Amino acid sequence: MKPMEHIKVVELSTYLAAPTAARVLAEWGADCIKIESPQGDPARTQGAVFNMPYSDEENLAFDVANFNKRFVTLNLKSETGLEVACKLLAGADVFVTSVRTKSLKKMGLDYETLKERFPRLVFAQVLGYGEQGPEKDSAGFDVTCYMARGGVFGTTVNRGDAPMIPTNGFGDFQVSLALAGGVASALFNRTRTGLGDKVTVSLHHAAVFALSTGIISAQYGNPYPKSRREVVNPFNNVYHTSDDKWVVICCPEYDRDFNKIMRLIGREDLVDSPELSNCAQVNARGKTWKVVDVLDEAFGRMTRREAMSLFKGADLPCESANEPLDIYEDEQCWANDILCRYPYPQGGRNFATNPVRFSSLGTPDYFSGGKQGSATEEVMAALGYTREQVDAAVAQGAVEGSKNLKRL
């Protein structure tokens, strides 16, 4: 039995963060119905932004956040469309949304209203900036709330360089897991209290939490961003190899590993160096750049493969700074089902599975829900609507059935 089997999820959200949380719940066995407006989730056409195909036959940019769902199209500005949504919620265990609170209130779909009507419902919401403060109603995406306001851009950049250009949704996918975990906890607590709960995760908060080490240490004089030539520990740094690749070494016990690493790279002359072998003294003298220079020279003589083989052979953590094309070829990913290949008509395509593993579940089966509105009639029939009522709702523009994706 899957962990979320018999749990019913209704989703009203767009783009990546909240939809992916619902996808994760669906992978765990939940029956997930996604509500879209007549305009559809904008993510359906985001493939154009990523140089990917987007069609009714192949739309991985949309599917990556929407596998294993059924899709209904409701005009929530209409009486009938809103009625259908509320009937869905009446039978649901979880409501997942990324709609801003002020908009939910206009529709009567905010937490306070739904709590009164459906006290067992778990209300799960992705927010940009949280529930309080001057930005609580502001628009935002992961690149603004998470990467920028949350400090990721300003912390992870090499000091003096422009902020990095991240993959889209970098913060969204992390938030999705946090929300799914919160939902699971709320459902467990409901077995004890009989009541649902409100679960929120903001992109802004998630980023600040992810930067916890920087947040706690900056106040003690460990400022960010840093230069790679001025790191506190040169053995926790990135180095450029002779084949124009980057590798990362992570050896937090500098004093213990200094002699071992110097011997490893052929610098026996620096073993027990009074100037460089003690991390505290190196930092006090402002000489970390000297150790970085030594390592730069050593790594500059090695290819990426040679560097990794040398350090891993000495049981010292060292990894390639991989790019997506490297990840496709990583046997470790395939051995652990980190990657999965979805069989589209034109060929299989790779995507990342969610990292939470259940020994009883294994790798989930994935299916694409297909066209927008593809389950509208089926879902309405299950709610008790007659064929005539469904047709009338379609004619009124309150609901829509299956329709082809329009290209931009």
Model-identified regions with their sequence ranges:
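Active-site-adjacent elements of ketosynthase-type condensing enzymes
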Residues: F209-R229
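Conserved Rossmann-fold dehydrogenase catalytic segment
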Residues: E131, G160-F170, T191-A207, P225-V231, ...
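Flexible, small-/acidic-enriched active-site or ligand-binding loops
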Residues: Y344-A392
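Glycine-rich beta-alpha junction loops
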Residues: Q39, Y129-G130, L203-V208, D243, ...
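Oxidoreductase and adenylate-handling cofactor-binding alpha/beta cores
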Residues: R149, S176-G196, T213-Q219, M262-L270
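A glycine-rich dinucleotide-binding beta-alpha-beta segment and adjacent secondary-structure elements
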Residues: G313-D365
